[in-house]
Design a protein with these regions (language model features):
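Aromatic- and glycine-enriched pocket-lining scaffold segments that form the walls
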Residues: 238-244
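Solvent-exposed, extramembrane regions of membrane proteins
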Residues: 214-235
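Membrane-embedded alpha-helical bundles of multi-pass integral membrane proteins
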Residues: 1-209, 223, 229, 244-248, ...
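Conserved short loop/turn motifs at secondary-structure junctions
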Residues: 69, 234-237
Length: 473
């Protein structure tokens, strides 16, 4: 329990910390937009490309996500402008002019002080979950070669993210964009399930007897949960943005931050959902497609993905969507049916087992993305040294580093690290299969029940190893 240490407890409860980090990140985000739209068309000399898709992406996938779960959401700048407008305040909690309380437990906003343009509507039930985030991610991923190599396109995509967040903040309650729409938030939430950090209540019984529910409704110390989470029922990381509001507002001192065994949330059976399982399949499929497009030797595939011709891109899009939405899920559906027989779970619907076993793919998927990110960062991070002095590519030399030459870093170590990551992900996924099967009453645990999934996971890992150690070498 990290809140045991007074110094860390004080830091985590500081409202200014969150505001400062978000404001600094917002400055970088706006600079990336301006550089992308107005700066040089050379991606390796443009701040918008280098610092978003290399530096930020490397930090997210290599450090923040595997170690901190939704830690990026704590400082993400995208919701900041909309939230400030929604609250009519930059830092102050409701007792000093905020607008987030009083609220109702059902989530609707009852405040009379809300700025009239911020309607505070509830998000439609039919659109809840992460299906929209799955679709948004697929859209960004499909055009990723264009977005990551053309600064102006990247800049306008970032503008769309910001405009979407502000627009939804003016119409819907709290961080609706983050919870249900953000294309990045979907996979961050999914992979946060394996993170070794969690925010939880200490004793749910205390919450049962506490009628005011300050953690959700807000009080003079802070806002109600921006993520629409009810901490007293929360037992998984997927929808908690680690904003820390409940740490400030809980009058019973019953909310804390813990270190825990990685992957604990994967076994929370009532949290198993088809949209999240599909996200696991989508992320694994894209983790195979990205190294083929960005790192592989297939020039024709790069040309297709880069929109060199409409017919080529059409063929690429068809294959991309088929792999993500049909082929990979279909293979795992077949494996789930075999597992149902092998584990003696014939009374369990195949659909239920298919969804549950989808979560066992999360460790391997995260490892695959870390492996891809490693190649991307090691090969390109040195561009950041020159770009920081000349963010627009206009010949500036702000810090005297403009002329530092590009050179790849640690590339001789990359294959070994990638292999270790993928093998560790494979082992973790197989162990998770066994743990998930044990949650079903009557399952014949052991080698027989695990074999179908283990065979599929091993084949997928071998293919990924070939991509990194063979085809891309």
């Amino acid at each position: 329990e990290l809140m045991r240490w007074p110094w860390l407890r004080s830091i985590l409860r500081q409202r200014a910390l969150n505001w400062v980090l978000m404001t600094v990140a917002l400055g970088g985000f706006l600079l990336a937009i301006v550089a992308g739209i107005l700066g040089t068309a050379a991606g390796n000399a443009n701040f918008g490309i280098v610092f978003v898709w290399i530096v930020w992406w490397g930090l997210l996938m290599g450090v923040l996500l595997p170690l901190g779960g939704r830690l990026w959401c704590f400082l993400c700048p995208i919701p900041a402008p909309g939230e400030w407008l929604q609250r009519k305040a930059l830092v102050d909690p409701p007792g000093n002019g905020g607008v987030t309380g009083p609220l109702s437990i059902d989530g609707s906003d009852r405040s009379e002080s809300r700025w009239r343009l911020a309607r505070g509507w509830r998000w439609p039930k039919a659109l809840r979950g992460i299906w929209l985030q799955n679709g948004g991610f697929l859209g960004v991923a499909l055009f990723s070669m264009v977005i990551l190599t053309r600064p102006s396109v990247s800049g306008w995509v970032l503008v769309a993210f910001l405009a979407g967040a502000v627009g939804l903040a003016m119409l819907f309650e709290r961080r609706t964009f983050c919870r249900y729409v953000c294309p990045v938030g979907g996979f961050i939430g999914l992979y946060s399930l394996v993170a070794p950090v969690e925010l939880r209540v200490r004793d749910p019984l205390i919450c049962q007897d506490h009628r005011t529910k300050d953690c959700y409704l807000g009080n003079e110390a802070g806002y109600g949960c921006p993520w629409l989470e009810q901490p007293w029922t929360m037992d998984r990381n997927a929808s908690c943005g680690l904003c820390g509001e409940c740490l400030r507002t809980c009058t019973k001192d019953n909310v804390t931050v813990n270190l825990r065994l990685p992957g604990s949330d994967l076994l929370v059976a009532h949290g198993w959902k088809l949209d999240e399982a599909y996200k696991a399949f989508i992320m694994l499929a894209c983790a195979a497609i990205y190294p083929m497009v960005f790192l592989g030797p297939w020039g024709w595939l790069k040309a297709w993905a880069n929109l060199d011709s409409l017919s080529g891109f059409g063929a690429y899009a068809l294959g991309f969507l088929a792999l993500n939405l049909v082929i990979v899920p279909g293979v795992h559906l077949g494996a789930a049916a075999l597992t149902r027989w092998a584990a003696g779970l014939c009374a369990v619907p195949v659909r239920r087992l298919f969804i549950a076993l989808g979560y066992s793919l999360i460790p391997l998927g995260l490892a695959a993305w870390m492996a891809f990110t490693l190649s991307l960062v090691f090969a390109n991070l040195s561009y950041a040294i020159s770009v920081v002095s000349d963010p627009f590519g206009w010949g500036w030399n702000l810090f005297g580093t403009r002329d530092v030459a590009w050179h790849p870093w640690l590339m001789t170590w990359a294959p070994s690290i990638q292999a270790a990551l993928l093998i560790a992900g494979l082992i973790a996924s197989i162990v998770t299969v066994d743990a998930i099967l044990r949650t079903f009453h009557g399952s014949r645990t052991g080698i027989r029940g695990v074999v179908p999934q283990a065979v599929i996971f091993t084949a997928e890992t071998i293919f990924l190893l070939w991509l990194y150690l063979g085809a891309s070498a």
